[in-house]
């Protein structure tokens, strides 16, 4: 059996989200960390920053990685979870906006940098939670959305996309068994893998 390569990475959120420039946090290598998980939320958000800023930030990251001998292995976002129903929103226009305006650009960036990515970008609305049939339908939609994201990630740099396992029924998956089902149901559609993160 071949085991996967595992990195002990430091998520730069440990610094209370105050290190927003690569030059200021890549010296963390002095503590022995060479793998870093950068936060889309802290450094650059596709919905709130300009393309010029994001491009500049990524150029600075490349220079800092070479200077300090450390690498961003993955990018992550969590704060969107608390802002919107996101990918579980009942209006497809909201879902499309997040996929086209946030997820696809994030995948492209991760793919170009040979990094992986993850997020928690769906919260099921309360009225759907209270209706078992609507709850099931919402999950079916999520499986399709995530399968499509998995395909896009595969075609744009073989990016591993992780969905953070959360802690309440509106942020599925939230149990071990539910996580297994979530991942299996996504993969069963078209063979596009989505992974999970346990925080």
What does each of the following model-derived ranges do?
Residues 1-115, 147, 188-197:
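N-terminal pre-domain/capping segments
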Residues 67, 83-196:
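Active-site acidic/histidine proton-transfer and metal-coordination neighborhood
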């Amino acid at each position: 059996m071949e085991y996967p390569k595992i990195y002990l990475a430091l998520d730069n959120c440990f610094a209370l989200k105050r290190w927003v420039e690569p030059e200021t946090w890549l010296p963390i290598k002095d503590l022995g960390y060479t793998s870093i998980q950068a936060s889309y939320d802290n450094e650059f958000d596709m919905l709130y920053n300009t393309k010029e800023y994001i491009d500049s930030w990524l150029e600075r990251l490349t220079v800092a990685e070479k200077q300090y001998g450390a690498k961003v292995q993955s990018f992550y976002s969590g704060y969107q979870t608390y802002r919107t129903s996101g990918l579980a929103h009942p209006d497809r226009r909201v879902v499309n906006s997040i996929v086209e305006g946030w997820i696809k650009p994030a995948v492209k960036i991760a793919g170009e940098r040979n990094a992986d990515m993850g997020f928690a970008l769906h919260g099921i609305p309360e009225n759907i939670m209270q209706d078992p049939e609507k709850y099931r339908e919402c999950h079916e939609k999520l499986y399709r959305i995530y399968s499509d994201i998995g395909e896009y990630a595969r075609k744009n740099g073989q990016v591993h996309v992780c969905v953070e396992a959360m802690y309440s029924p509106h942020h599925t998956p939230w149990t071990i068994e539910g996580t297994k089902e979530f991942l299996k149901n996504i993969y069963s559609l078209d063979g596009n893998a989505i992974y999970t993160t346990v925080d």
